[in-house]
A protein has these predicted regions:
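Extended alpha-helical scaffold and adjacent linker segments that couple domains
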Residues: 1-395
């Protein structure tokens, strides 16, 4: 019999930790663990839970012990595991408040009595025993809130008051895991309200960043919950949205996300099609951790600005700013759903192809065709010549 019986009995433990983490800015994946058959089996449980969490969530392994012996063993396991590359982005939390062996025996007795009453259709007695068991867990959670917990992440450990769990996560723990995430900016983290970090499809933010061309225009449109976006941009770009000379190229998330996107596009095979969600999927993982929110959508939108008119839909049309707004939103949708989207599969046009396209437009006067004059790529030009131009000339 394992302490996990306590954690999974009813909703008391889940409710307690939902409350403790309610002010954590980043989405979290809360998972409860206790001593199991052996250390390897416990770590395997954690590995399985990681696979079910979203890559941008802060994975919290909440470890609770029945007694001090269990608690200390959990600390040893957490300390070792935090140095294991399999758990490099896992936040292990071991709580000092234990349930107690005597309480555990009473709890088991309540559970057994509840099951016995249930088998004999004694609903009132079953409910009474169940209520007593739940009350014991509720009291334990009160002790947990009043005590301390130890955090183990990336081979380092710290101790905090449980009442300050959310602050500890926001200030020191989440930025350690998502070191290229928006929460690494002190001003943004301390001044942005919870609504700023809310998981949402902030399309208006994508539109403003891709459609306007000055800092004042973009920030002027960032009102209400989006207002803190100014803290994301103010130390990174000038009035014309160019990088400031003193931008922190090692740490500023806006710069790092933009560099990632630029590197991926520049190094892509220009002869092959290019899917934004697939090519940029690493942005959803640590150390970036982009998710659909004001900050996440703003960073990807800004990173796509240099590629306006430079990537093409599969029919040969260039993606203008208004198109990229939809493309950014579709990319986040694809990530969130975990499903590929053909809507964001694009191609490139080489320098030579662009020059040939312009030459064909000039030689054959393709812009003056009556029925098809919106020509913006070599593919367009070829189609116009073989269909519209030849038809008009009577070939």
């Amino acid at each position: 019999k394992y302490t996990s019986q306590l954690v999974t009995y009813g909703q008391e433990v889940r409710k307690a930790f939902d409350t403790l983490t309610s002010n954590v800015s980043r989405p979290v994946s809360i998972n409860f663990f206790s001593l199991y058959v052996n250390e390897a089996a416990l770590l395997h449980q954690i590995e399985n839970a990681i696979e079910k969490a979203k890559s941008y969530e802060l994975f919290m392994a909440i470890m609770l012990g029945r007694n001090d012996e269990e608690m200390n063993e959990l600390k040893t396991i957490a300390s070792h595991a935090s140095n294991d590359e399999r758990f490099t982005n896992v936040v292990f939390m071991v709580f000092d408040a234990t349930f107690g062996d005597d309480n555990y025996e009473r709890f088991i007795e309540y559970m057994a009595n509840a099951q016995c009453a249930s088998r004999h259709n004694l609903a009132d007695q079953r409910a009474a025993h169940d209520k007593n068991a739940q009350a014991m867990i509720s009291d334990w959670m009160k002790e947990v809130r009043r005590s301390n917990f130890s955090v183990y992440v990336k081979g380092e450990s710290e101790t905090f008051s449980t009442m300050k769990l959310a602050t500890a996560v926001n200030v020191g723990i989440a930025p350690k895991v998502f070191s290229r995430g928006a929460e690494t900016l002190d001003l943004l983290r301390t001044r942005a309200p919870k609504t700023f970090w809310k998981n949402q499809q902030a399309k208006e933010t994508a539109k403003n960043i891709l459609m306007f061309n000055t800092y004042d225009e973009i920030i002027g449109k960032a009102t209400g919950p989006a207002l803190p976006l100014k803290f994301l941009f103010q130390d990174a770009v000038d009035d014309n949205l160019h990088w400031k000379e003193n931008v922190d190229k090692e740490n500023h998330p806006l710069y790092l996300v933009s560099e990632f996107v630029s590197r991926k596009i520049k190094n892509a095979d220009k002869a092959k099609e290019f899917n934004l969600a697939e090519k940029f999927i690493e942005l959803t993982r640590a150390p970036y951790g982009l998710f659909p929110s004001y900050a996440g959508i703003a960073m990807l939108s800004f990173a796509m600005r240099p590629w306006i008119n430079k990537i093409y839909s599969v029919d040969g049309k260039p993606r203008l700013a208004q198109h990229l707004v939809d493309d950014v939103m579709e990319t986040f949708k694809s990530w969130e759903n975990g499903k590929p989207s053909n809507k964001i599969t694009f191609t490139f046009e080489t320098k030579e192809a662009g020059q040939l396209s312009k030459l064909l437009i000039k030689v054959f006067k393709l812009k003056s065709l009556k029925t098809y004059s919106d020509i913006s790529s070599l593919k367009d030009a070829r189609w116009a010549i073989s269909h519209e131009y030849t038809a008009e000339k009577g070939y």
